[in-house]
Amino acid sequence: MNASSWSLRNLPWFRATLAQWRYALRNTIAMCLALTVAYYLNLDEPYWAMTSAAVVSFPTVGGVISKSLGRIAGSLLGAIAALLLAGHTLNEPWFFLLSMSAWLGFCTWACAHFTNNVAYAFQLAGYTAAIIAFPMVNITEASQLWDIAQARVCEVIVGILCGGMMMMILPSSSDATALLTALKNMHARLLEHASLLWQPETTDAIRAAHEGVIGQILTMNLLRIQAFWSHYRFRQQNARLNALLHQQLRMTSVISSLRRMLLNWPSPPGATREILEQLLTALASSQTDVYTVARIIAPLRPTNVADYRHVAFWQRLRYFCRLYLQSSQELHRLQSGVDDHTRLPRTSGLARHTDNAEAMWSGLRTFCTLMMIGAWSIASQWDAGANALTLAAISCVLYSAVAAPFKSLSLLMRTLVLLSLFSFVVKFGLMVQISDLWQFLLFLFPLLATMQLLKLQMPKFAALWGQLIVFMGSFIAVTNPPVYDFADFLNDNLAKIVGVALAWLAFAILRPGSDARKSRRHIRALRRDFVDQLSRHPTLSESEFESLTYHHVSQLSNSQDALARRWLLRWGVVLLNCSHVVWQLRDWESRSDPLSRVRDNCISLLRGVMSERGVQQKSLAATLEELQRICDSLARHHQPAARELAAIVWRLYCSLSQLEQAPPQGTLAS
């Protein structure tokens, strides 16, 4: 190790930027202030206030507000559940264990049906009830139930208030700035994505880029929620922001549709690629208007109206340009603060889908885990069994919704072991020698500030540092009055580690569904929703089905199963492109009854080839042949409406042709 590595510049306090110092000081002061206030309010376990302040330490105002609201609602719901369940079953340990396990299983199941703050509230409702109720097994007076429950809720609220106050005193980056920057970056990235997808090659990089764009647009919905809570102007513009996100998803769909047409177009004009690149370069400039775009794409205007392939590509390209320019104008209005509620229609939020099978399985896992640990604790009369139950409940509820639960549980195990060793040194080496809280704060403040800085400066270990900060309070366990019992300390820490280890074992036995199974369930749900789109009165609108489809696709974005990801993406793109054609056919009108019957026949062909179980290859081949015959016949028709219909039908042909390579039924794609 060279001498330069020991220089002062490499120490976290000197490497930190001003923004990092602001973040670290804000969270450190909030945690120390919460501990102090809870201590002098004579709450029996004030360290929970410090933990609560650590949990809501988001870098933005909107994140703190939304997280705090979810935490308060979840804590109140969990406290009420603990009072009701423990109050009626306190003298019946087996019934108490059964009711608490059922409640935590229900919360695990419920949080899978929601996102963001509502899911977080159900998580809090689950393990707050565990934190309050499981330690009650050793009490004899029913009146103590209320005292413990109100103390826990008060500690949580104290931590939230301290975190919110410090966010107002030392504010961080603006949610509005983060959202607008993300929208602008995605707006520019769509042009890069179009340039990549409109190439004739088919590579894994294209699939990964498409998944990345979809995931990034859906992630911006979280930024929209945080901006909604941080500033009144974005609450007024919420409908516009929803419409912008839907518009970016629609542009992603149009880019994919244009790619399918380019791949199925036997002889496009020779200068198509050069004109498209010139168009994308022009759209990247904020000074480009509709006249500039019209001049650039004018050479691609079809001269032969009977060439339905050329007409279809031309119409879809114009639609993409119009969408992109409209989105540019809306972004400019948002950035300049111009309030105009007439430009974009009110749009619902992004739709989502819940995997009910996985949610039920997660709830069952939580129930079985807690019943197993509780039965062992009751049979062995283990005094620290409540701690094992509490940590197991937290682990099962929190990590049922993550993509890699074993990795998260292993990290938590490592965190608990490190904290056990650290808290032993602090508790029996330092805390026994001090008598006032302010003396302990002189040690705690620089320690927390350093840990906060290290979390920011070491991204690879940010999750570890974050867990060390959050769980440190419950291991040091600053109480009023302080308690120093080595046997209880050792027993409690061992119980916490055993609880997480048993939760890990439960995940190993009752394993989450494989990515292949999840992919099949998502594909089946996609096909079921698409069949509904073919009905006369579909349940979902065009934009709702679009956002729901992209939500399905994003669910396996972190999967290591390349085949599962590929076929989920392929089915999503195919069904989405077909749904856009169906909606356009439904809106297409003609005074010619024969043409209307042709339109209805195309939709009926889709009903015949597609079902929830999958697609029949023989029916698919016959359908593609029939669609090609319809296109050729309509192209020779004397009515302009017929040639327009031929272009729409050819888009349907291009979308369905991607399924010719689908595996047979009984495999992943079916």
Curated annotation (Swiss-Prot):
It is a multi-pass membrane protein. The chain crosses the membrane at residues 23-42, 47-69, 76-98, 118-140, 153-170, 381-403, 410-432, 437-454, 461-483, 493-510. It comes from the Bacteria. Keywords: Cell membrane, Membrane, Transmembrane, Transmembrane helix, Transport. InterPro entries: PHBA_efflux_AaeB/fusaric-R. One of its GO terms (molecular function) is transmembrane transporter activity. One of its GO terms (cellular component) is plasma membrane. Signal peptide: none annotated. It is found in: Cell membrane. Its main location: membrane. Belongs to the aromatic acid exporter ArAE (TC 2.A.85) family. This is Uncharacterized transporter YdhK. It comes from Escherichia coli (strain K12).
